[in-house]
Design a protein with these regions (language model features):
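Active-site-proximal loop/turn and secondary-structure-junction residues that shape catalytic pockets
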Residues: 33-35, 63
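Active-site C-terminal subdomain of aminotransferase-like
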Residues: 1-8, 40, 44-146
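Alpha-helical scaffold elements within enzyme catalytic domains, especially in hydrolases
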Residues: 15-19, 119, 130, 158
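Active-site phosphate-binding strand-loop segment of PLP-dependent enzymes
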Residues: 1-31
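Conserved C-terminal alpha-helix-loop-beta "cap" of PLP-dependent enzymes
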Residues: 125-176
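General beta-strand structural signal in soluble alpha/beta enzymes
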Residues: 27-31, 57-60, 140, 167-169
Length: 176
């Protein structure tokens, strides 16, 4: 998903990939929230599509419970040439990289990565319904776990006394 929870559909990703490759530019997909995008109810993109259309992408780990890191996937052989040595020479390779790998091996065993992602979306949809039942709208409609309700500033002030939350932006004079 994007920063506001919307997703790219297959046709959009294909068009972006086409333009990038036509212009000789590699396409990188930031996969920090990849599981949530791929498990969204209206998603039509598969992991295989991403691997086919992108030159480099990563599979985010921390947002689905990993202690740290992302798994970088390089599908373009030109980019992958000597990649391992470049990151090692620049201090980007962990001496004990297997610790990172074990997390992803575990996350992808028995579909755990997808289960965690689906569960997060299901919980976000419950929150969304509760906000809607109270008459609140959302910054943007989406089907991922990133639900951004727009609330009256007075309500936010009351919430700030009891809860921690992130402020996105003001949507008008009295709502955020």
């Amino acid at each position: 998903p994007t920063e506001n929870g919307t997703i790219y559909y297959k046709q959009e990703l294909e068009a972006i990939s086409h333009v990038c490759h036509e212009c000789g530019m590699p396409l990188f997909l930031d996969g920090a929230r990849l599981g949530y995008g791929l498990m969204a109810a209206d998603n039509d993109v598969t992991l295989e599509d991403i691997a086919r259309l992108c030159d480099v992408f990563y599979i985010g780990g921390t947002k689905v419970g990993a202690l740290f890191g992302e798994a970088v996937v390089i599908t373009n052989p030109v980019i992958s040439k000597d990649f391992r040595y470049m990151i090692k020479q620049r201090g980007g390779m962990l001496a004990k990289g297997r610790l990172l790998g074990i997390q992803f091996q575990t996350l992808f065993e028995d579909g755990l990565y997808w289960q965690i992602s689906r569960h997060a979306i299901d919980m976000a949809m419950k929150l969304k319904k509760a906000f809607q039942a109270c008459g609140y709208g959302f910054y943007v409609e989406n089907s991922t776990n990133q639900q951004l309700p727009v609330l009256p500033d007075a309500v936010l002030e009351k919430l700030a006394g009891k809860y921690s939350y992130s402020f996105w932006e003001k949507t008008d004079e009295s709502h955020s």
